[in-house]
Amino acid sequence: MASINEFIQKYQAIQKDFEEIIENPDWRAECRKKKINVVSKGKKVNFKYDNRCKLKTAWTRSCRGVCVEFDTETGKPIRKPIYSFNKFDNRHNEPDFYNNLLECEAVVLANKFDGSFVRIWYDGVEEKFVTATLGTLSADDKFLVAETMMDQRIARHLKGNPYDCLLAELITPKNIIVTDYNGKSFLTPLSIVSHVDGLPRWSTLRKVVPDMFMENGLPYYCRFTTIETLENDLKEFEQMTIDNPDVYGRIPEGVCVYQCSLKDGLVDVATPMSKIKRDEYVSVHGKPSGKKEEKSKPPAILGRAVTDPKFLQQHAILKFIYDDIEEKTEDEFFMVLENWYENYKTIDRDTNVKKELFGKKDHDKYGRTFRDLLLEIDNKGRTKLEQFFCRYGPQWYQ
């Protein structure tokens, strides 16, 4: 049986391993190897695993939206990383793993709001708030609105504690996924991550916005459970969310299961362990949206199947097709593509390829990566990748 203290130690050990990685001058190569997306904005760098990352290496589990600021001269981190939650997944993926960890001090069910996950912190040097999603540091307008929706008490706390990070769920009519909140817009605080130790604390949030919490020390959208009563409590909790659409929306997504430590009888550290989605939500989420679904087919140029291995490798990188991308794709292409993505604002646009890729569009504003651009389909059904490969050859990206 794992105690909460043991779990917190493991939680922080994963972060410590990550901090050792980024102290190494070759951290970019290590991130490429482990399939961690690295996005730069000035001195700030964001780390987020992608869907190719197997998460077998412990430190990669901390890369669920981590911001690190590096010194431009030494290449070393200026300060401790700004963490989000460590990686957690659907409970059904590894039920024995989660159930074992849940046998400890305190377990909590929390409603899983169906919106956009945002991070907000105060930069003590630039003296301004930073709003980011998990995968990028360049939040567009629909996410920046989160700053204006933030409770001013939380804003004051963040200003007084630079680099403490608010984790929140942003709900607006513009970012509806499945759950219908009847046109409402709101920002639900999930936790405040201490910059000192990287731990998400409800105790901090409770001090700042006490009216968001119940007498038992839990946020209003939570309830205690135990491993023995989890399944029954889960059914009752789900029914409660269904019966209260004004609070939880129509077709609520499900729950997150938190492991918590107690301090003076109230929850202190609260770390999400797993998520359990409702069957109704999954069935609706899986239905076609009305848009024509893209059929899976072999890549082709001008209507003819392409067998050139370089094209297939490049296509696989963009589509994240391979299970083991290290052995089956072209590292050089991936490195060049990443370099373009990281430096798109100052990139040299001399080549025809770069001019076509960038054009006059503000790609950062639209939140698109170069992978998106290369897979963009024209009115003839061809991707940019196909066009470049056909026009300039296998080494078009050089």
Swiss-Prot record:
It comes from the Viruses. InterPro entries: T4-Rnl1-like_N. This is Uncharacterized protein ORF64.
